[in-house]
Amino acid sequence: HNWFWLIPLDERRTSVGVVMDIADFRAAKVTPEAALDEAFAAAPIMRTRMAAAKRITEVYAIGDYSYRNTRMHGPRWLLAGDAAGFIDPIFSTGVFLALHSAEQAAATLDFALRHPLLGRIRMASYARNLNRQMNRYLRFATAWYTDEFVDVFTAAKPLFRIPQAVNSVLGGNIHPNFSVWWRLQLFYLVLWVQKRHALVPRLEELKAEAAPAPSGVT
């Protein structure tokens, strides 16, 4: 499940790249430039958009850029935003987590300054909450790269309003009510089952059915 980014840098330059499974990249045994060109060729929209583009820098590859600090706080310091961790940007949660954690960090530091004896406890609570939030978004991002996630999330007839629950959390609902929470748990259960037994049509099967028959075959 490759995905592309196109980020305008100015009126004439745009950062363009593709995120792909590292196993696929290694198996292809090609240069980063060749891998990027092959990804463009396999995606009609990107192939069209990049047809007249001029490459002005070298193409390079970088491995897993998600990270998490093992320690979020200490005497007279607290981590927030990208200093605390960074999650795969597929769902664009980075800015949200950075701003939200900054707000929570400010509140935590304010409390610690006003209540020095309880500051360490409040900082530990902050770290637990931030880790919990990053875990939730990392779980979504990891699931995205599986066939079953795409099957379930894009099903023509969504099961139990699961996509709405997922979108609610991806949209910033970090304290979901029970109605959303149980659908999220069901979502992961459905993914587990979908991997083994098709509850909804598999995308690869739908693609095969929609593909035109070879010439001369009826």
Task: Outline where the language-model segments fall.
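A short, hydrophobic, proline-anchored segment that marks a local hinge/packing element in signaling
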Residues: 7-11
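C-terminal helical "tail/cap" subdomain of flavin- and related membrane-associated enzymes
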Residues: 107-218
